[in-house]
């Protein structure tokens, strides 16, 4: 059952989804009902967003474990709507048993990550189940019975899916996190992406003695750092298109030495002062090349040739192949100066490194 809730974003009608926290709460409630002898195909839960979700439940069963304890078990499949969420389609399971003290004890099992660093939402060693989902789970199972429950949340796909998330960088290993502050996934939430970036920076501040940070837009740049001894050991944060927001936050946290490593497609924009590199914000890649070529005395034919390219990758490679890669170095220095102006601090130590997929980093 798909969630019939939509938002309008940049003129597009996008479908919302529900969080892993909502899945866990619904699965736990269903498992508690099963433990009491009920059968169902869906359960209703309240969300912090003020919406009531009616979520389909699957893989329902009741049984006794080896010591004779009665167990209820159920699963809910995550629906991320139109959000590009790596956990979309994953099954979140709950396994519950009764207590007699009215308490609800919640833990994570297979596929649920464990906290490995201080400064997150729980203690080191605890299951990566955020506070709001914990509250949702407790609220829903206590609707079924006031006896209390032991609740184990697990996901057989979680260990593999967790590798595709930001988890390891923020101090969660071994699986996915059960998250969500509203219970609803709002598509392409820029705030959510930025909060993840900020959380990574906070994690580095808490757990690293390094006073320098490496910011990369994506996975390829992170892998490329292995080729540079000067940055190979730097704590790294993937910042997507949010260069300005990430720089400002890192600077506010005391980082005064920062290296940025990125593809020419994004950093051409940065070289002329574009700090959100999403193509809907600005597409000034060729304009950047034209500016730096003109400033360094390139002839009209060269400028026109570069301006006619469709991608920044082509332009980068053309400059290398025609031995005018000094323009690329000028773009790196230009980006560094733009960052200092953006942060209003000329004393910063900023290093910008630009690469192409074909030639890698320029020497």
UniProtKB/Swiss-Prot annotation:
Gene Ontology MF terms in the entry: cobalt-precorrin-5B C1-methyltransferase activity
EC number: 2.1.1.195
Pathway: Cofactor biosynthesis; adenosylcobalamin biosynthesis; cob(II)yrinate a,c-diamide from sirohydrochlorin (anaerobic route): step 6/10
Pfam families (UniProt xref): CbiD
Classification via SUPFAM superfamilies: CbiD-like
Catalysis performed (reactions): Co-precorrin-5B + S-adenosyl-L-methionine = Co-precorrin-6A + S-adenosyl-L-homocysteine
InterPro entries associated with the record: CbiD (IPR002748), CbiD_sf (IPR036074)
Key words, A-Z: Cobalamin biosynthesis, Methyltransferase, S-adenosyl-L-methionine, Transferase
GO BP terms in the entry: anaerobic cobalamin biosynthetic process; methylation
Enzyme superclass (EC): transferase
PANTHER family (UniProt xref): COBALT-PRECORRIN-5B C(1)-METHYLTRANSFERASE (PTHR35863:SF1)
Family the entry assigns: Belongs to the CbiD family.
Name of the protein this chain belongs to: Cobalt-precorrin-5B C(1)-methyltransferase
Provenance organism: Treponema denticola (strain ATCC 35405 / DSM 14222 / CIP 103919 / JCM 8153 / KCTC 15104)
Gene name linked to the record: cbiD
